[in-house]
Amino acid sequence: MVAPTLTARLYSLLFRRTSTFALTIVVGALFFERAFDQGADAIYEHINEGKLWKHIKHKYENKE
């Protein structure tokens, strides 16, 4: 008997039934959105280092 390949196991676990297929797509979209958003924020902050308020607010805060 031949061992099932990775793609065959993925198909049988995640994509065979419509309900698990839809759930897989939704969960994948949520993780992708989170990763993309954090990556875009990191790139934006790197490009604008020293120009954003959170980087320069210590210069303008009153110290009492």
From Swiss-Prot:
It is found in: Mitochondrion inner membrane. It is a single-pass membrane protein. Residues 2-21 are mitochondrial matrix. It holds the Pfam family UCR_UQCRX_QCR9. GO terms for cellular component: mitochondrial inner membrane; respiratory chain complex III. Residues 48-64 are mitochondrial intermembrane. It comes from the Eukaryota. The chain crosses the membrane at residues 22-47. Keywords: Electron transport, Membrane, Mitochondrion, Mitochondrion inner membrane, Respiratory chain, Transmembrane, Transmembrane helix, Transport. GO terms for biological process: mitochondrial electron transport, ubiquinol to cytochrome c. The keyword Signal does not apply. Disulfide bonds: none annotated. InterPro entries: QCR9 (IPR008027), QCR9_sf (IPR036656). Belongs to the UQCR10/QCR9 family. Component of the ubiquinol-cytochrome c oxidoreductase (cytochrome b-c1 complex, complex III, CIII), a multisubunit enzyme composed of 11 subunits. The complex is composed of 3 respiratory subunits cytochrome b, cytochrome c1 and Rieske protein UQCRFS1, 2 core protein subunits UQCRC1/QCR1 and UQCRC2/QCR2, and 6 low-molecular weight protein subunits UQCRH/QCR6, UQCRB/QCR7, UQCRQ/QCR8, UQCR10/QCR9, UQCR11/QCR10 and subunit 9, the cleavage product of Rieske protein UQCRFS1. Component of the ubiquinol-cytochrome c oxidoreductase, a multisubunit transmembrane complex that is part of the mitochondrial electron transport chain which drives oxidative phosphorylation. PANTHER family: CYTOCHROME B-C1 COMPLEX SUBUNIT 9, UBIQUINOL-CYTOCHROME C REDUCTASE COMPLEX, SUBUNIT X. This is Cytochrome b-c1 complex subunit 9.
